[in-house]
């Protein structure tokens, strides 16, 4: 049985941990609102760009003049998995769920005889993937020094991706991130960004007819590389909101668990102390009777 001193130290230790988890929960809650607003603000722009590019691509593909970012390289042997995770832990299953989805995709592709490589954004995803695929990781982007995410961060990543495409490093690129729904719901998502996949547009009778100036080919040549950066930026913002939501939930659970443990240890402490007092009283009474 633990001594009273051990129990007091244990209770004090759990209380100190509870203060830390409570503080982290409050910080995550404060940052979540700003991150959620940024993620929600980026969605309409990214979705609208997809719509515009889908309309443009429909005419170009039909004419057989589609650029490589839409038509692809003509092969699907080499796959690049762009895995975006967080730089820190203590956030529940946020990082693990994204990496799990990427691993499942990698195992499927390798089983089909495809060549798979990883482009990691975030230290936590890199640390997990290098245990299983140490020789398949070709790039790591560390964002720990970035205080506020900007479009330039995504643009720099997109430039590296496009350079790898020009070098023939891959044929298909799939982006992995966590789609923020709510504090308790973040959905791991896989999105193919090269070649781009656009949702089919419903062209009913009487629908709008678009005319583009300059030519569609010139617009696509400018917008398609930017769209890669836009989709990556959106994924980074969704990840940021998902991280804080998951961290807030995880720290709330940790704080509650610490409270339960404090109650349990306090009960054990009181029972142990009561038993020791009772034992001492019995010894005193027994000694008095012996006299």
Curated annotation (Swiss-Prot):
Cell membrane among the record's keywords? yes
Supply the alphabetized keyword list.
Answer: ATP synthesis, Cell inner membrane, Cell membrane, CF(1), Hydrogen ion transport, Ion transport, Membrane, Transport
For membrane topology, the record states: Peripheral membrane protein
Q: Name one GO molecular function term.
A: proton-transporting ATP synthase activity, rotational mechanism
Query: What is an annotated GO biological process for this record, any one?
Result: proton motive force-driven plasma membrane ATP synthesis
Record-stated family: Belongs to the ATPase gamma chain family.
State how it assembles.
F-type ATPases have 2 components, CF(1) - the catalytic core - and CF(0) - the membrane proton channel. CF(1) has five subunits: alpha(3), beta(3), gamma(1), delta(1), epsilon(1). CF(0) has three main subunits: a, b and c.
Q: By what name is this protein known?
A: ATP synthase gamma chain
Species for this entry: Xanthobacter autotrophicus (strain ATCC BAA-1158 / Py2)
């Amino acid at each position: 049985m633990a001594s009273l001193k051990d129990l007091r130290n244990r209770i004090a230790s759990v209380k100190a941990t509870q203060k830390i988890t409570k503080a982290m929960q409050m910080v995550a809650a404060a940052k979540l609102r700003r991150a959620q607003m940024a993620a929600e603000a980026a969605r309409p722009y990214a979705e609208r760009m997809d719509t515009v590019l889908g309309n443009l691509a429909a005419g170009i593909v039909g004419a057989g003049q589609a650029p490589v970012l839409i038509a692809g390289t003509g092969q699907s042997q080499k796959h690049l998995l762009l895995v975006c995770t967080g730089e820190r832990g203590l956030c529940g299953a946020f990082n693990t769920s994204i990496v799990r989805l990427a691993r499942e995709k990698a195992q499927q592709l390798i089983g089909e005889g495809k060549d798979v490589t990883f482009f990691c954004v975030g230290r936590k995803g890199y640390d997990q993937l290098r245990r299983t695929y140490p020789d398949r990781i070709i790039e790591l982007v560390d964002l720990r020094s970035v205080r506020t995410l900007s479009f330039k961060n995504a643009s720099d990543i997109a430039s590296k991706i496009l350079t790898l495409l020009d070098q023939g490093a891959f044929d298909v690129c799939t982006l992995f991130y966590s789609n923020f729904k709510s504090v308790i719901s973040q959905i791991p998502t896989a999105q193919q960004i090269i070649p781009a996949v656009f949702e089919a547009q419903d062209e009913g009778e009487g629908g709008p007819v678009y005319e583009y100036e300059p030519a569609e080919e010139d617009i696509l040549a400018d917008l398609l590389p930017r769209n890669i950066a836009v989709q990556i930026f959106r994924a980074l913002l969704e990840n940021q909101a998902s991280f804080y939501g998951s961290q807030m939930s995880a720290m709330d659970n940790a704080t509650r668990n610490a409270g339960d443990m404090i109650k349990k240890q306090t009960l054990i402490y009181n029972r142990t102390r009561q038993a020791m007092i009772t034992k001492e009283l019995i010894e005193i009474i027994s000694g008095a009777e012996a006299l």
